[in-house]
Amino acid sequence: MDADEGACDARGFAYGTAADEAREGLPACLAGFMRLCADGFAQGWHEANGGNLSYRMTPRDVDDFAPAFLPEGARGPWRPIETRGVTYALPRLAGSHLIVTGSGKFLRNVPTDPSANVGVIQIDPAGAAWRLVWGLVGGGSPSSELVTHLRGYDARLAAEDDCRVVYHAHCPNVVALSTLIRPDARTWTRMLWRSMTECVIVFPEGLGVAPWMVPGSPELADATRDLLRTHRVVVWSLHGIIAVGTSFDEAFGAVHTVEKTAGLYLAARAANGGAEPPRMVTDAQLRAVCDRYALTINEDMLDDGRPA
């Protein structure tokens, strides 16, 4: 078979294709999922099995994907939503279906073989268990950060945000910067806001920042859930970024903005002999941008003393 002819998995979906046209048989949500994985790998954010992605499907997505789901009797067993022995009930997610990257899977392989590297899971009516209904052909389980993703969705839904995507990437500039800057949200937010004008537009609420914690641990899931209640982007010190969005573009764009600006700040500081760059966006300019775009800036991140 020629490389550009593609193939089909056991459920009838095309993969291994060289042209987007060959993917017309894919549900749109899976095609978008695959593209984000490819874009993130192209940016250099996903070494080995680093990073993970999930998508909370809409009812239409489920209808489009349902013909490919495993028959009821062939679906995986119900498994508790748990990490390291700590279990969770998330009733806001009851009955949901999510596309999730697999544990130990390389995101670079998702576009060429989605059914082996990605799964669709269903949450039970109590929001306390999940089962596999498609994918992860050949064995495997959802990402080790599954609980962090699910609790992130729960936090955003509680904030009345129609969150559809949770994306975690190992962004090199952010990780490098976290070796130099203490894990303080105000410090990080001002540093990035003042380095590039676009930042306050993308995250006017500021950044959440978590200190180093064991990946996949209940502690990291708890801290991330708490921060995602009020932030769409959270820095994991010495680890990477996790971001949420109502679309693939929104989540990817947030990560891209933070990572690019971290690189700009590092370059400017290096060019200035390691000192803080002398010309940065002022608080008055930040306010002017937010006024122009009708955004509510997080007053706690400003130094100009003007009341909210």
Question: What kind of region is each of these model predictions?
Answer:
Residues 2-308:
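Glycine-rich flexible loops
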